[in-house]
Amino acid sequence: MNALFVYGTLRPGHSNAHILENIGGEWLAGFVSGTFYERGWGAAADFPGIVLHPDGPRVEGYLFISDNLAAHWQMLDEFEDGYDRVEVTVTTLEGKQVKAWIYQLQPRSA
């Protein structure tokens, strides 16, 4: 898959956008369904996070599409420590549905 949905600091205009900008690709506005948290927990405690849920509220963000992503997943997975990379269906503002990866908060530990 050559697409990543971002909703936090990796979005254009935010503190870590340069990470994806350096990979090179195309940005499309879109949304997923889930619960957005301004601050996560565990290793992600100081950063925004999401827990996906098909009946959850709409969480807006950006779909980053790049053929170069395959060469960068290991680096991105390490950067997103505290999150799990899972598959999601993103709806673009034009109504198109696109399969992509997203970094979701890891389950809370008991």
Map each language-model feature to its residues:
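Glycine-aromatic micro-motifs
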Residues: M1-A110
